[in-house]
Design a protein with these regions (language model features):
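Short capping segments at the starts of secondary-structure elements
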Residues: 18-26
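Short, cationic-aromatic polyanion-contact patches
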Residues: 5-11, 63-82
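Short, hydrophobic-biased segments on the C-terminal half of alpha helices
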Residues: 46-50
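Glycine-centered, phosphate/nucleic-acid-interacting loop/turn motifs that mediate DNA/RNA or nucleotide
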Residues: 56
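C-terminal regulatory/oligomerization modules of transcriptional regulators
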Residues: 81, 104-129
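Conserved segment of winged-helix/HTH DNA-binding domains
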Residues: 74-99
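Short acidic, hydrophobic short linear motifs in intrinsically disordered regions
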Residues: 25-34
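Hydrophobic residues on short alpha-helical segments
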Residues: 13-19, 99
Length: 129
């Protein structure tokens, strides 16, 4: 049976986005990136990164006198899992109500709709083969 990684909190996801952008980061790198948007303590960032390592999202390596961190899974894979977990938890596993909410709230652009149609066509053709 596949074991799921624990869900990311809002702050953890912020940290992961910084690391995915940079590839490899120190606590200071992440702290400075987050500090540009809001006030946060260095020790908070360090604690959160240690938690992310314990959860299995980050790998820590020593480089010179500092530790560097890198993601253990690609951003797309993590987000896919988060969306799947959200749909399961909120919509009992059905994506249809989610799509209806997005369409009703007009959060989907024409470009997004074109991309969705293209993906649906490709998915439908793949199932026919």
């Amino acid at each position: 049976m596949l074991t799921r990684k624990p869900v990311l909190t809002v702050q953890e996801l912020e940290i992961m986005k910084v690391i995915w952008r940079s590839g490899t980061s120190t606590v200071r790198d992440v702290y400075e990136a987050l500090l540009a948007d809001r006030k946060i303590a260095y020790t908070t960032v360090m604690t959160m990164m240690n938690i992310l390592e314990q959860k299995g999202y980050l790998k820590k390596s020593q480089k010179d006198r500092a530790f560097t961190y890198q993601a253990t899974r690609p951003q797309k894979q993590v987000i896919r899992g988060m969306v799947r977990e959200f749909v399961d938890r909120v919509f009992n596993g059905s994506a249809e109500p989610l799509l209806l909410h997005l369409l009703e709230d007009k959060r989907v652009s024409e470009q997004d709709l074109d991309e969705i149609r293209s993906l649906l066509r490709a998915n439908s053709e793949g199932k026919k083969s």
